[in-house]
Amino acid sequence: MEIVYKPLDIRNEEQFASIKKLIDADLSEPYSIYVYRYFLNQWPELTYIAVDNKSGTPNIPIGCIVCKMDPHRNVRLRGYIGMLAVESTYRGHGIAKKLVEIAIDKMQREHCDEIMLETEVENSAALNLYEGMGFIRMKRMFRYYLNEGDAFKLILPLTEKSCTRSTFLMHGRLAT
């Protein structure tokens, strides 16, 4: 196994089809083609793949992370991890963690104040991964998923702005 991490080439339809297949097989939510295009067309620099150069198909992703970033309430820049998937035969080798680290690093360089995501309450592997990387449970969202499963919203604070209520930031109450 020789894992290489790189940005997704959005012009490569084979890579796109592979990450769609990987995510569709791995996540509980079905995503339409429009959701993928929304992320990939607006934030192509925030999608990374992992490939195994020693496999018979070295250009086919065995892991991926799909992210975006937006202003949040016009007071902070929020990164968002929308999708993270690793092929089941490659789990347990730190691939998901490395993909998250790459995404966090990129969002920090883009001056995000925080990074947010949701994950299923029952997904202990994901919760252990994210909380081990510093993400904090912010709230439980009941019946969040189509399967009526609950989700936790997790946030990784990156700057002081992330630790200050938006109301105070909007009204200029943050001491600088």
From Swiss-Prot:
User: Additional info?
Assistant: Present with 1940 molecules/cell in log phase SD medium.
Q: What protein name applies here?
A: N-alpha-acetyltransferase 30
Gene transcribed to yield this protein: MAK3
- Give the EC number: 2.3.1.256
Q: Which InterPro entries match?
A: Acyl_CoA_acyltransferase, GNAT_dom, NAA30-like
Q: Name one GO biological process term.
A: regulation of protein localization
Swiss-Prot/TrEMBL keywords: Acyltransferase, Cytoplasm, Nucleus, Transferase
Q: Which residues cross the membrane?
A: none
**Keyword Nucleus assigned:** yes
Instruction: Indicate the quaternary assembly.
Output: Component of the N-terminal acetyltransferase C (NatC) complex, which is composed of MAK3, MAK10 and MAK31.
